[in-house]
Curated annotation (Swiss-Prot):
Ligand binding (Mg(2+) 1): D279, D283
Name of this chain's protein: Terpineol synthase, chloroplastic
Keyword line: Chloroplast, Lyase, Magnesium, Metal-binding, Plastid, Transit peptide
Free-text function comment from the UniProt entry: Monoterpene synthase (TPS) involved in the biosynthesis of monoterpene natural products of the 'cineole cassette', volatile compounds present in floral scent. Catalyzes the conversion of (2E)-geranyl diphosphate (GPP) into alpha-terpineol and, as minor products, sabinene, beta-myrcene, limonene, alpha-pinene and 1,8-cineole.
Length: 522
């Protein structure tokens, strides 16, 4: 038996159950609702200039409170789309372009014709053009990032610069806004916004209250899934596997933080925890014969295949079977959930066969399997049934065949995972990842391979943007947002290495800030 050499969890059951949050219950709701009504009046106030409205919407989004004002925001953006005249500044044009695209409005890259070349000294405009460029789709050459990135890097070398702009530039170059996890961005931006001279006290108070109230709801979700995880006994009986319940819950906040989706977060945390455990059965524990038997049992959903397996592998099977029966209150859903889990386990088995035979697949072979083995299809199939009401027959067809929205989200998750984890996994003796496959196939250095993977991520984001913009799919908006948020969460979790299995300090700090530390009142 191999060993994953994983560290124990940092957050045990007793710690999670002991967490107290002052913002639970209705204590602060009266003040919050008052602030919300005042904010609605401000958003819809007559006489505001177009740019002022766009800046307010941008701040609402970055502070994490725009979901309270969806109707008002769409009303303003619809009006801007219909009646807007070309802006004379690069900054205003780029902000308008990004916000309209984010909200599903068709807006052409031609809006920038003649602007970008004449505004190279407008650093704020260049920053907003850089951020807008990440909403590009394939073939939109006007929105290439290279020259704006070069300009922004040069700007940071200057001594006498606007420190607020410099912070935003540095953050954008580290990871663009479109790729960032929404709730972490809100946590950071609240601190940034608090120090701005144009800060609106009403909006700041609303954002802080909202963050803390939502955080309290998340903690209740976490306590629930911690009790479930303890009851499964998997952490104790699978000592070779990653015990990462809090990290698994952290993923679900990235996918959908909205307080009313607590049930979805609880179910998706269970999905993530079972995926992590079963992944480690294939990667670390099982022999090839055992893994073949386990896969056969999953494929047939028949316990006869389990007879010769170790008890802890049987335990995994029964935990998964119990979970599917718990979730699928509608019998029609069961085949779709089982198919997704079967596809996942079959992809794990392919990787196990490569490992035991010491085979290095071609890049194409690897990628054809790896976008499934990263588990995004399983996660998103469950997400659909948790969001869609009623279920759409056409959507079920696209779901079973993994629509491009699922496929591109999965591919970003896979590639980001490979960038963050491949070094550690090779030390453990894992199957080669995309980096090693590309190095072997193209005879290039590791850094060249990593650069190629980064390029693939950028190109895949363009495809995901395109899939998001296409109206001809039967999925609810919230499902499409969840797929995009899963890709964002991948960028977050693997930005500084293996944030899921490795428990690096950056991920620990992010989890603490998001789950366990409230923001003090302004």
């Amino acid at each position: 038996r191999r060993s994953g050499n994983y560290q124990p969890t940092m957050w045990d059951f007793e710690y999670i159950q002991s967490i107290h949050n002052d913002y639970a219950g209705d204590k602060y709701m009266k003040r919050f609702n008052e602030l919300k009504e005042e904010m609605k009046k401000m958003i819809m106030a007559e006489g505001s200039q177009e740019l002022e409205k766009l800046e307010l919407i941008d701040n609402l989004q970055r502070l994490g409170v725009s979901y309270h004002f969806k109707h008002e925001i769409m009303q303003i953006l619809s009006s801007i789309k219909q009646h807007s005249t070309p802006a004379d500044s690069l900054y205003a044009t780029a902000l308008k372009f990004r916000l309209l695209r984010e909200h599903g409005f068709h807006i052409s890259q031609e809006i920038f014709d003649g602007l970008s070349e004449t505004h190279t000294k407008d650093t704020k405009g260049m920053l907003y053009l850089y951020e807008a460029s990440f909403l590009a789709t394939e073939g939109e050459s006007e929105l290439e990032q290279a020259w704006t990135e070069k300009h922004l890097r040069e700007y940071l070398k200057n001594k006498n610069i606007d420190q607020n702009v410099a912070k935003l530039v540095h953050r954008a170059l580290e990871l663009p806004l479109h790729w960032r996890m929404l709730r972490l961005e809100a946590r950071w931006f609240i601190s940034f916004y608090k120090k701005r001279q144009d800060m609106i006290p009403l909006l700041l108070e609303l954002a802080i209250l909202d963050f803390n109230i939502v955080q309290a709801a998340h903690i209740q979700d976490l306590k629930y899934v911690a009790r479930w995880w303890k009851e499964t006994g998997l952490a104790e009986n699978l000592p070779f596997a990653r015990d990462r319940l809090v990290e698994n819950f952290f993923w679900t906040i990235g996918v959908n933080f909205l307080p009313q989706y607590g049930y979805s977060r609880r179910i998706e945390t269970k999905v993530n925890a079972l995926v992590t455990a079963i992944d480690d059965v294939y990667d670390v524990f099982g022999t090839l014969d055992e893994l073949q038997c386990f896969t056969d049992a999953i494929q047939r959903w028949n316990t006869d295949e389990l007879d010769n397996l170790p008890d802890n592998m049987k335990m995994c099977y029964f935990a998964l079977d119990d979970f599917i029966n718990e979730v699928a209150c509608d019998a029609l859903i069961v085949p779709y959930l089982r198919n997704a889990w079967t596809d996942l386990c079959k992809s794990y088995l392919i990787e196990a066969k490569w490992y035991f035979s010491k085979y290095i697949p071609t890049m194409e072979e690897y990628m054809d399997n790896a976008w499934i083995s990263i588990s995004a299809p399983v996660i998103l199939v469950h997400a659909y049934f948790l969001i869609a009401n009623p279920v759409n027959k056409e959507a079920l067809h696209y779901l079973r065949n993994y629509h491009d929205i699922i496929r591109w989200s999965a591919l970003i998750l896979r590639l980001a995972n490979d960038l963050g984890t491949s070094s550690d996994e090779l030390k453990r003796g894992d199957v080669p990842k995309s980096i090693q496959c590309y190095m072997n196939e193209k005879k290039v250095s590791e850094e060249e391979a990593r650069q190629h993977i980064r390029l693939l991520i950028s190109e895949t984001w363009k495809k995901l943007n395109e899939a998001h913009n296409v109206a001809a799919h039967p999925f609810p908006k919230m499902f499409v947002k969840s797929a995009m948020n899963l890709a964002r969460m991948a960028q977050c979790m693997y930005q500084h290495g293996d944030g899921h299995g490795g428990q690096n300090s950056e991920t620990q700090n992010r989890i603490m800030a998001l789950l366990f530390e409230s923001i003090p009142p302004a």
